[in-house]
Amino acid sequence: MRIRRPFIQILILWFVLSPVWAWCEEKPLWELGAGLFLLQMPDYRGSDENRRYLLPYPYFVYRGDILRVERERISGRIFETDRVLLDISGNGSAPVSSSDNPDRQGMADLDPTFEIGPSLNVTLLENRQDHYKLTLTLPVRAAFSTDFSSVRHEGWVFHPRLVFQKADIIAGSGVSLGISAGPMFADRGYHRYFYAVDPPYATPTRRAYEAGGGYSGSTLTVGLNKNIKPFIISAFVSVDFLQGAVFEESPLVKNKYAVMAGFSVSWVFLKSSRMVEKRD
């Protein structure tokens, strides 16, 4: 197992780790702990090269009225009603060394990316008695890459999703289920960063290719979460389906699907005595 750079712990855990949701209930204002995370993911969506990471990480949760720091995201709440929430969402990708990826041999490395932008979240269906909820999320994010000496804007991403949450899926089990699904769209700049092959990098087995903007595939994610105090156990599987994506014919796309899976154990050893309502 390889850890390419120390920052990747934060990048993966805050932006890539698929969300596992908890039902609305009272929670401590903040929690502090540590954990261990096992992740397998492709170099990029469509790559046939996969990496495994085993990472320790700090566990920190803050549930403020405006700023929320959760296991799955950092968000700033701009506007909220009973059914509608406007906040800030993020995402990201890990760096790729082209020398370690046969399909990118001789090309420039892929720097890590991060995405940030507003997200409109609309509750379509909610049943507090049976503990389930259906939400439509509509995030629009600007994507940036960085080599830690400069930051470059790479493009825009729109990733609408339907999110279903169910607490205690088997009565008395304490296991929460989350399922999300939806298409992804991105502009030419974003697709070009991952899938374009400029003429100087073309080879007999890797033709030149110019990526366009549009449909970027669809994603299905399933996650499970269980609290066994003072531990929190989470697992997820996420699959990207790339059939019909505008970059499908890129010579850098070797798989028409991409699978990412992870498992984490968090130990919460310190928390606030002040309780607040936990809202997703």
State the predicted function of each range.
Residues 36-40, 58-62, 73-78, 116-124, ...:
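Residues on the lipid-exposed face of transmembrane beta-strands in outer-membrane beta-barrel proteins
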Residues 39-45, 93-99, 123-127, 141-149, ...:
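Sequence/structural signature of outer-membrane beta-barrel proteins
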Residues 44-49, 75, 105-111, 127-129, ...:
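Outer-membrane beta-barrel domain signature
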Residues 30, 50-56, 82, 110-116, ...:
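Residues that define the transmembrane beta-barrel architecture of outer-membrane proteins
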Residues 220-280:
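Predominantly the C-terminal beta-signal and adjacent terminal strand-loop region
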Residues 151-232, 240-245:
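Outer-membrane beta-barrel transmembrane domain signature
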Residues 46-50, 99-104, 147-154, 189-198, ...:
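Outer-membrane beta-barrel translocator domains and adjoining extracellular loop/strand segments
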Residues 23-30, 45-46, 65-85, 125-134, ...:
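Short loop/turn motifs that connect adjacent beta-strands in outer-membrane beta-barrel proteins
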